Amino acid sequence: DQTEPHVKEMSPSMQAYYVNNLGNYYYYQDDYKNALQSFLRMKKLLEQHGMMRTFDMYLCKINLADVYLNLGKLNDATAMLDDVEPYFRAQGDNTSIYYCNTIRFGIAVRAGRMHEAERIMADKTDDSLIPYTLVNIRNKYKRRYYELTGDYDKAYALLNKSIAYNDSIEHNLSNMRTAE
């Protein structure tokens, strides 16, 4: 990577932006171990620069929560959510609240707590203003839920929806932005 040797020359905010994008790149490749390393690197960078209570740190921690979920580290995922969710609620950040609920749903499904998962999803948030990348993440966890509860028709429908999105121009443009 040509950027890596020049990272130290960037401002702390730009370094965080770069490392966050790197973590997102790995996340969308389903490479959760490297995504984890990237987001932990971002967290350490922000801590070293006294940026503990910034949007960048909360963004880092919500991303860590999702990565921990995908690595099966449910306690770590929950701890990260418990730390960031009050901040996003206080800010009225509906996109981040949607993402927190998505991760909480994923944790409940992964832990086999289907009644809790159903309760979380009973809140029908309007996702028309939510970036589709986050809707797609929610759909991934909903597919798992439907598979585990035996509703294969709904799981299959969501899979087809995700495939259509992943083949779309919007998705390709999103990947190009992430790769940059």
Q: What are the functions of these language-model segments?
A:
Residues 2-8, 40-50, 82-89, 122-128, ...:
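Amphipathic alpha-helical segments of tetratricopeptide repeats
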Residues 17, 55-59, 99, 137:
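Residue register of alpha-helical TPR repeats
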Residues 13, 53-55, 95, 132-133:
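Residue signature of alpha-solenoid helical repeat architecture, marking inter-repeat boundaries
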Residues 115-118, 122-180:
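Hydrophobic positions within repeat-based interaction scaffolds
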